[in-house]
Every structure is written in structure tokens, then in C-alpha cells.
Amino acid sequence: MKIIGLQSSSSLARKVAEQLHSELVLPEERRFPDGELYVRYDADLNGEDVFIIGNTHTDAEIIEMILSLSAVRDYQVKSVNIIAPYYGYARQHQRYRRGEPISSQIFTEIFASYSTSIATVDIHDEQTLSYSKVRFTDLHADRSIIDFYRHVDIDYVVSPDDGGLQRVKHVAEALGKKYFYIEKKRIDDRTVEMKAPDIDLNGKKVLILDDIISTGGTIAKSSSILRQKGASKIYVSAIHGLFVNSSESKILENADEIHVTDTVAGKFSDISVYQVVCDYIAGKHA
């Protein structure tokens, strides 16, 4: 078995390789003068189960993944398996308006044509899984988050909307904490009102948990609401921390701490999903 770590996930891939006592293979990469990407693998991959760990968030990451798949397949590998901790374009899992592509379907079909299996962590919408002709597994980071907060003093786990309530319920019950969600009510096509339930939060410590932090608007507003209700400590966590346009700054106007998983590497990625990935690989390689 060999673990390949692409640029976006090299740190996570290293942790996985160390835990599984497997060789970590890193690609030789450079840019041509015209900006195109060169990828080469100088390793003995013949007869191996190969696991490529890398995100498909940015266009550059997608190109790196496709070129890597093609290069690895040139060896007589036993299998080539994609693990994309953050699976990009999954929010375009259907056609919302005429003339749009179903982006996640296009990329999933490409990846499936070059691989034996695909896995990701908490995909945005499970519709994307159905677009693959090979097994596509959605792993879950709940256990990593639960382990991280197991010894942190928290009174409530909060979902910033009702859509994430089941995840919050699961985490809260595992931690033995109470939970609730912040209600969203659309006033008009430009205005959404957010309101917390009538709960006394004076002096309480709360954890806001979401699947993705992108622009951070919902999380920032949720933090503000909870602070106004008297919360003394506000933790913010998410599975995927994208932090578009440095959105962490507006979140930290009211939140005290931010902790996200390392599906996307960054300054707040101190909750690792490496054990979740290791267990998945061990199960396939058994």
C-alpha cells in the first residue's frame, strides 16, 4: 500500500501514512513557463493499492488530481483510490437554471473513470455520490469533533440553522450537552431574520457547529445573537473551513475561538480527521 499526498492535503496524508506505517509518496511538480502543471511520480507503485489524498476544491487542485490519476495508472497498480477530504463543486449538484452544468456530476464522472473508488468527508449533498460508477463513500468527521471537545467546558451545542440540527444533536448527545438551532425566517427576497430560542444563556459557554465556513456571514450573525443573549464563551467549529475573503475576522468579532478540521489546511485546522481516513483505508486494505 502507498499513500500519495497532493499539495492541498500533504500534511493530512503524512499523518495517515505514519499511522498506517505506509510509505508516503509526494509528486514531483513544477509549472511550465506558460503556467501549465507538470506532474511526475518517481516511485515503485507496481502491484500496490494506491490511495491519493488531495482536495478538489480549486481548479488547480482538480487538474493536479486528474494528472496524478493518469500518471499513477501507468504503473501496474492493484487499485487507485481517491480520498478528497473536501470535495469541491458539490454545491452545484443539480441544475438550478437552464443552461447551467451539473458541475459535481462532470467531475465525479471524470474521477470515477480513472479510479477504483472515491471517498470524501461530509460531502455537501449526497446526490453527488450517485454520479459515480465506482464506489463513492462519504466519511464523517463527527467523531473527530467529539474527541476534540470531550474535555472542553461547554453548556450548549448550537446549529446556525435547522439544516445542521441532526449533526449538532449527534455531537451534543455524545458530549452529554444540550442543543438547539437558530431559526431563520425570510422577511423578503433580501432580508433573513435570525432568532435564537428563548433560552437563558447568561454566563453559558456555547459551541456553534456547522458543516462549512465559507463567507462566514451566518456564523458571524449567530455569534452576535448568542453574545447578545449573554453567552460568556463562544466556540465556533466546522468540518470544512474555507474562510473566503478572510471571513474569520468578522467571526472573531464575537466568537472567542475557531477550530475546524484539517480537511482544508489552514491556521484554524487543529481538529484532525486522520483517524477517520485511516480507519477507512484499513477497512479497504484488510
Curated annotation (Swiss-Prot):
Kinase listed as a keyword: yes
Short name of any one Pfam family annotated for the protein: Pribosyltran_N
Organism domain of life: Archaea
This protein's name: Ribose-phosphate pyrophosphokinase
EC id: 2.7.6.1
One GO CC term, this protein: ribose phosphate diphosphokinase complex
Keyword annotations of the record: ATP-binding, Cytoplasm, Kinase, Magnesium, Metal-binding, Nucleotide biosynthesis, Nucleotide-binding, Transferase
Protein residues bound to Mg(2+) 1: H124
Residues bound to D-ribose 5-phosphate: R186, D210, S214, T215, G216, G217, T218
Leading EC class: transferase
Pathway in which this enzyme or protein is active: Metabolic intermediate biosynthesis; 5-phospho-alpha-D-ribose 1-diphosphate biosynthesis; 5-phospho-alpha-D-ribose 1-diphosphate from D-ribose 5-phosphate (route I): step 1/1
Species: Thermoplasma acidophilum (strain ATCC 25905 / DSM 1728 / JCM 9062 / NBRC 15155 / AMRC-C165)
GO biological process entries: 5-phosphoribose 1-diphosphate biosynthetic process; purine nucleotide biosynthetic process
Active site residues according to the UniProt entry: K184
Function description: Involved in the biosynthesis of the central metabolite phospho-alpha-D-ribosyl-1-pyrophosphate (PRPP) via the transfer of pyrophosphoryl group from ATP to 1-hydroxyl of ribose-5-phosphate (Rib-5-P).
Subcellular location: Cytoplasm
Chain sites annotated for binding Mg(2+) 2: D161
Alphabetical list of Gene3D superfamilies matching this protein: 3.40.50.2020
